[in-house]
């Protein structure tokens, strides 16, 4: 299939060219054939976005012999990578994600972008076509938005968190440039000092927006797995 990705003012389409499965041992299979469609000058951005310079096979091999559960999880999720996404987009997206399903999160983020983001023409595709995209809104674009307006976008109780975070980011109290330079522990403490960001959301931002791969977000599903596969077995 083919998938579309928007980050900042950039647009990418990524496509699996064929089902090129390769069996590397008794339990592991790989599919590595894919193609990017983007502007040539943006290729390095997307290579970093998809973390293509990291050896994920080495990560998997480091746990394979010690942990049969993670071995099977790695097989099931073969090809998954930790994306280098925009920190501001991740802050709002994971605040929105609280108590929401993935389709509802996508719907809310798209509504926010349509109403407050900037339209932009980007990405030369096949046949020299250009794609018109709507970028995720910046802090300054959202700084004056009211809680009532956000509630109308079905953001519920999260609206009050978003209002405060946008004001903090636009006013400089939430310093995104400084956040990008922080280590994991410092970034966690800094993020949790802001209204609406707790332990799990801060870990999600650190992992997917700041690429601190030591971050470990624990939601209901992860907690169930930990209890079932690890804590209970130790007793």
Regions found by a protein language model. Give the residues of each.
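HhH-family (HhH-GPD) DNA N-glycosylase catalytic core used in base-excision repair
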Residues: 1-235
